[in-house]
Amino acid sequence: MTKKFDSTLEGHFNIRYKSSQNVRGIVQLPHGTGKKVKILVFAKGDKAEEARAAGADYVGDDDMIQKVQSGWVDFDFVVATPDMMKDVGKLGQILGKRGLMPKPKSGTVTTDMKGIIAQLTSGRIEYRADKTGVVHVPMGRLSFNPDQLKDNAEAVFQAILKDKPSDAKGDYVVGMYVAGTMTPAIRINIKELR
């Protein structure tokens, strides 16, 4: 018996973009991405126990730092308590280039383990524009029903508009396409998302 491949549906939002504008943000997808994420938490003592209880896949301090330094990167998100950041900073070369370095601005440097782990496991994603002004975002699986995919697309669209730089003029999102992992892209009428 073969297992059917459930393709990820990605949204590609074309934005009117100047390279001087830093286009990035965070959005909570109402129906998640459909992907089971692995979370690594750097914490000690009570916060480590809290992270384990909240559902973190990997929790530790110096032992996990050494494991990552040896090349292990089998996780999707990294969270750290503020007191661990001095040591986690040593992993900047490894985590930074993969976009996994914990940052206070993204909420991944925190003492609220229960809150951040709940967000990460329920469909919170970070997005940023590439050099050409396109934001690429996973919006769910092809097995999702159309209303779930539409809700997720609207959430991303509204988040991008909310994070619009103040000096951006005119229409900010100028096009949207969706494509599955192994499917052609389809243009979406963004007027229906407004």
Residue positions per predicted region:
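Translation machinery proteins
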Residues: 1-49
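Flexible glycine-/small-residue-rich
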Residues: 13, 43, 81-82, 139-141, ...
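Ordered, amphipathic secondary-structure segments that act as subunit-interaction surfaces
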Residues: 39-56, 62-64, 85-87
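Residue-level signature of catalytic and energy-coupling elements of molecular machines
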Residues: 51, 96, 178
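Long, charge-patterned amphipathic alpha-helical coiled-coil/hairpin "stalk" segments used as oligomerization
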Residues: 58-161
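Flexible, glycine/charged-enriched surface loops at secondary-structure junctions
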Residues: 5-9, 163-175
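Intrinsically disordered, compositionally biased charged tails
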Residues: 167, 187-194
